[in-house]
Amino acid sequence: MPLRLEIKRKFAQRSERVKSVDLHPTEPWILSSLYSGSVCIWDYQSQTMVKSFEVSELPVRSAKFISRKQWVVAGADDMFIRVYNYNTMDKVKVFEAHTDYIRCVAVHPTLPYVLSSSDDMLIKLWDWDKGWMCTQIFEGHSHYVMQVTFNPKDTNTFASASLDRTTKIWSLGSPDPNFTLDGHQKGVNCVDYFTGGDRPYLITGSDDSTAKVWDYQTKSCVQTLEGHTHNISAVCFHPELPIIITGSEDGTVRIWHSTTYRLENTLNYGLERVWAVGYMKGSRRMVIGYDEGTIMIKMGREVPVASMDTSGKIIWAKHNEIQTVNIKTVGAGFEVTDGERLPLAVKELGSCDLYPQSLKHNPNGRFVVVCGDGEFIIYTALAWRNRSFGSALEFVWSSEGEYAIRESTSRIKIFSKSFQEKKTIRPTFSAERIFGGILLAMCSSDFICFYDWADCRLIRRIDVNVKNLYWADSGDLVAIASDTSFYILKYNRDVVASYLESGKPVDEEGVEDAFELLHEVNERVRTGIWVGDCFIYNNSSWRLNYCVGGEVTTMYHLDRPMYLLGYLANQSRVYLIDKEFNVMGYTLLLSLIEYKTLVMRGDIERANDILPSIPKAQYNNVAHFLESRGMLEEALEIATDADYRFDLAVQLGKLEVAKAIAMEAQSESKWKQLGELAMSTGKLDMAEECLVQAKDLSGLLLLYSSLGDAEGIEKLASQAKEHGKNNVAFLCLFMLGKLEDCIQLLIDSNRIPEAALMARSYLPSKVSEIVAIWRNDLSKVNPKAAESLADPSEYPNLFEDWQVALTVEKNVASRRVHYPPADEYLNHAEKSDMTLVEAFKRMQVIEDEETEDALDENGEPDEEVLEENKVEESTDEAVEVDADEPEETVLVNGKEGEEQWVLTEHE
């Protein structure tokens, strides 16, 4: 059966002919050497070029990373080897290495060595710790040496491929080859070693269009791979998967099974001839160099093949080797930190006859099934003995220990606990996946059908695209994961049982009330498990979350991809594994889960009984959960964080509680927030106290001015000046009618022009004094401008109604400190737009007219007219402008002002 490897193209870049490729071990970089003479570094994540080196005008046939030195080493047709620092772009070394084209360079994995091979039929060893001295020359080939590669299992030996049709094995320190592998009909272009520990193999590719697998211990050809129609230019054993990759000048890349040597897949990206293949240990990425560019593919999933039983025993598969660890072996003396790799002792359990692609314990942990290559094998978990096997595309366990296999899209078989076949189901649709658990589920591309295990009766069809399915241990809840979200459903088993017992027919949709949708969460689930009624999962952003009652809580932000293994209740820890088989644990309290579950069920009394068992450090977590359920009062009682308790108290309108928290915290922001809330609720005394504590002078100005509190405004003016809040201080002084202090504040703030203009409008008698100050200050910067300033006392003709303004100032000076009560505002509002100077002049005109009317024909006073005037005077109101109303606009000497005055008739 085929491996069914998922192959995805991750990077594609057109360029000149690519002669070699390499992957960086830590950075997301691809190194390509081009026939045009340059070397490029591409970032396959951002799909951009990171670096480019112009090496030579002739082809660069080989380039490799030396990551431990931050170098790139390249060999070209100009016979020189060049070394560059890929961080600084500096050229580290240039030296002539051969007398003909350099075909290949290979870097020793640990020692400071580089091998080079050439058309001069020589292989040379270079030591960069000795200034790139040539420390050894290997002679023996009779034609071009096309490639050299170190043996990863014995780095003291290496292999070379030559157009003399041979492959030779060499040892460092010996000038002669250990032995020669001869079997190809034409020249050998490429060679690579098998990286696994179980087979001493290497592979070669030749111009005879074949690739040969060799056992270098017996020196025999194990297998010949035929299928390409042109020269094979690149070969490799994949370091992680049981496959062989061959690339040819026929434009195809062929993927072969490394055990059965069956052709699994053929790739053709239409970029003409294949020249190079690159890989990296620990990664499933492969990079391919073509005539017209570079392609990177990713094969299979990087999810580790591992399973944990309920006691903490973990079994995993590394290639065909099966290993086991036990979490309980971590001693009590070891302090376990969340996210820290556990120091687990790995034991070899055995090997597997097929390449494992999935591995899963049965519910009681006694058996383990391994699936792969279209087959399954059931082993005992302790002794790793084979109990059953067969062909299957998929295998699932039931909650009772039975199992089902999917042989094809149209046939599913069910087996008993004793491994005996019970039933065969032929679904009426194409079953692309099956899932186990309480019910047997089969899904197509856009729906899923649930069946009971006993009689295979349809329970329910649900129209949803399913990627995975997770049953709770209780069997009452199930999570259905799709591409973008997951759904929590309740399984009503009693409803189903009563319906089936009634004998009513089941239609193609199943039992209508079998499932009840409880929650939908818009997050993609990568892996998930149930703990009681709590669903734990990691999402597409690799955050470890849990969901109780539809409320999602993030436990931890994972720094790399990790996959859930299980939960141990006695340790209150959830365990995960990464692709390197490192196991980490994270704390998740069972009492916390139980508490949230009871709250969701409305059983508050039992939830409160559990609360004392939850550590105080988790109380804020509990409070946030209660807040999300709308239980703010309970959240406030439980929360321990001062900031959070303050926010809850504000939400509840409990100002006294919030005030007590603010007193402890002494936070200006809290006092300000509380002051605004107190003001909005009419608690003005508390608002004043809060604003004072917050030093919110603007807020106090609003409060005092609204209350008409002259004493408070006076104190605020002093505070504002002390704190340098001149705008607030000015407004306070202005509202108090302290014009001299306002002008002095402007002068002290170096706002002398504004002081002069204000004096012109409100205190004409002070203008001359301020102009002198202004002139003196301005003369330091612009003497001519200073001389042009006019003093009203010297040039009264330039200032309209100057004498009238001085007279008005004298008349109203005594009234500036009197504040009419607020309830008399309407009596003054109509006169708020009156200009004092104009009013004064008009009153003078009226007096003159009245004097003329009071004289008779002989110029003597007319007693009758005088008597009428007295009556009118007694009934007319005085022309008043309220000096304490800053909200209205008053025109003074034709200027806008904010002060209001009370005018009396001129006697």
Curated annotation (Swiss-Prot):
Acidic residues compositional bias, start-end: 850-866, 874-887
Gene Ontology molecular function, alphabetical: structural molecule activity
BP GO annotations: endoplasmic reticulum to Golgi vesicle-mediated transport; intra-Golgi vesicle-mediated transport; intracellular protein transport; retrograde vesicle-mediated transport, Golgi to endoplasmic reticulum
Record-linked SUPFAM superfamilies: NHL repeat (SSF101898), WD40 repeat-like (SSF50978)
WD repeats: from-to residues: 13-52, 55-94, 97-136, 140-180, 183-224, 227-266, 269-309, 351-389, 461-501
Family: Belongs to the WD repeat COPB2 family.
Subcellular location: Cytoplasm; Golgi apparatus membrane; Cytoplasmic vesicle, COPI-coated vesicle membrane
Sequence segments annotated as region (Disordered): 850-887
Function, as annotated: The coatomer is a cytosolic protein complex that binds to dilysine motifs and reversibly associates with Golgi non-clathrin-coated vesicles, which further mediate biosynthetic protein transport from the ER, via the Golgi up to the trans Golgi network. Coatomer complex is required for budding from Golgi membranes, and is essential for the retrograde Golgi-to-ER transport of dilysine-tagged proteins.
InterPro entries linked: Beta-prop_COPA/B_2nd, Coatomer_complex_subunit, COPB2, G-protein_beta_WD-40_rep, TPR_COPA_B, WD40/YVTN_repeat-like_dom_sf, WD40_repeat_dom_sf, WD40_rpt
Membrane topology annotation: Peripheral membrane protein
Subunit-structure text: Oligomeric complex that consists of at least the alpha, beta, beta', gamma, delta, epsilon and zeta subunits.
Gene source species: Oryza sativa subsp. japonica (Rice)
Pfam family, one: TPR_COPA_B
UniProt entry keywords in alphabetical sequence: Cytoplasm, Cytoplasmic vesicle, ER-Golgi transport, Golgi apparatus, Membrane, Protein transport, Repeat, Transport, WD repeat
UniProt entry tagged with the keyword Protein transport: yes
Protein name (record): Coatomer subunit beta'-1
SMART domains assigned: WD40
A cellular component annotation (GO) from this entry: COPI vesicle coat
